[in-house]
A protein has these predicted regions:
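Core AdoMet radical
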Residues: 21, 41-52, 68-83, 92-109, ...
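N-terminal [4Fe-4S]-dependent radical SAM core
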Residues: 1-23, 285-306
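Aromatic/hydrophobic pocket-lining residues that form the small-molecule binding cavity
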Residues: 57, 84-88, 135-138, 167
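Short, well-ordered alpha-helical microsegments
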Residues: 82-86, 106-110, 164-167, 249
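Accessory C-terminal segments flanking Radical SAM cores
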Residues: 192-306
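Canonical Radical SAM [4Fe-4S] cluster-binding loop centered on the CxxxCxxC motif
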Residues: 3-56
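N-terminal active-site wall of soluble small-molecule enzyme domains
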Residues: 61-64, 85-92
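Conserved C-terminal portion of the radical SAM core fold
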Residues: 132-222
Length: 306
């Protein structure tokens, strides 16, 4: 394979293997039943319908590998990817790499059988509702998956007001067990008559800033959205989003008006160069990894129009 520019979203150990990164929100079910689920997952009685099969996924992702080489596939979204192990098998067999966002409710042995732990990292999220607020039970399963060979870069948590008083304790427990943590504020949610993240009080903001990962402006500055100071973005150039139905979008915040669909035998139409972004705010988890040119806030409109 010819050399290509390293993708900032791909872990260092795979930068020479995966030119492109994609996020695929294929999951359509979750058993966690968290009362605070913003997507209504607590009310799901069965998986959401889909028009494609696991076999379709196997064929499609095999074709995408032949067109793009092995890709870094983020198995994420609002529901639980491990509820559809057949899709994870398809991605692994097709020869891709990536990560799986998970609540760890799947049996560790089943997950290790579905995907190659050497190809897929785990991005687990600790949901206190599922584990009755007990980090040790979650850690037991986490350690089993680590023993299976999975790389676990961090354990994520959301700073829900109901659980805020225990956040520092849980972070300490995970760090003591050898895991980095990624605490994120609630975003665009209401609880007990308050709007979050705007209504975190000053004391909570001090705690949050102490727990959130440092060194990246999306984490240290973006408790609330901040105006973009970006001239161009690599979304659509070396990264894209794919919906559950298979529609290909430049990014989840600004969908394409006429997206391709991977299940219609369409190729992903990568942009030749990073493109300007006309949004006032960016809510992408990859902020500042995808954005390639930073400009002064006052120059943003000119940069977009250029």
């Amino acid at each position: 394979m010819s050399a290509f520019e390293p993708n900032p979203l791909v872990p260092d150990r795979f930068k020479g293997t995966c030119r492109y990164a994609v996020s695929w929100a294929f999951a359509g079910f979750c058993r966690a039943r968290c009362f605070y689920c913003f997507a209504g997952g607590q009310n799901l009685q069965q998986p959401l319908a889909r028009a494609w099969t696991d076999e379709d996924a196997m064929h499609t992702w095999g074709r995408l590998r032949s067109q793009n080489g092995p890709m870094w596939v983020g198995c994420s979204g609002i529901f639980e990817p491990t509820e559809e192990l057949g899709v994870l098998v398809a991605l692994s067999v097709a020869g891709h790499y990536g990560y799986i966002q998970t609540n760890l409710m799947a049996e560790p042995g089943e997950l290790a059988d579905a995907v190659d732990p050497g190809r897929f990292d785990l991005h687990p999220t600790f949901h206190p509702h599922v584990w009755r607020g007990e980090a040790p039970a979650f850690l037991h399963r986490l350690n089993r998956l680590r023993d299976e060979g999975f790389t676990i870069p961090f354990v994520a948590m959301v700073a829900h007001p109901v659980y805020f008083r225990w956040l520092e304790q849980w972070v300490d427990e995970f760090v003591d067990a050898g895991y980095a943590t990624n605490v994120q504020p609630m975003r665009s949610m209401q609880w007990a008559g308050k709007d979050y993240p705007a209504d975190y009080n000053d004391a909570e903001r001090v705690v949050l800033r102490g727990l959130m990962p440092g060194g990246d402006p999306v984490y240290t500055d973006n408790i609330e959205p901040v105006p973009l100071r970006i001239a161009s973005c690599s979304a659509g150039h070396n990264y894209c989003c794919i919906s559950r139905s298979g529609d290909v979008m430049r990014c989840a915040q600004v969908p394409n008006t006429e997206p391709n669909n991977i299940f219609n035998d369409n190729a992903i139409d990568w942009d030749a160069e990073p493109l300007p972004c006309g949004e006032e705010f960016c809510r992408c988890n990859h902020l500042y990894a995808l954005h390639t040119t930073e400009v002064d806030a006052g120059d943003h409109a000119d940069a977009v129009d250029a």
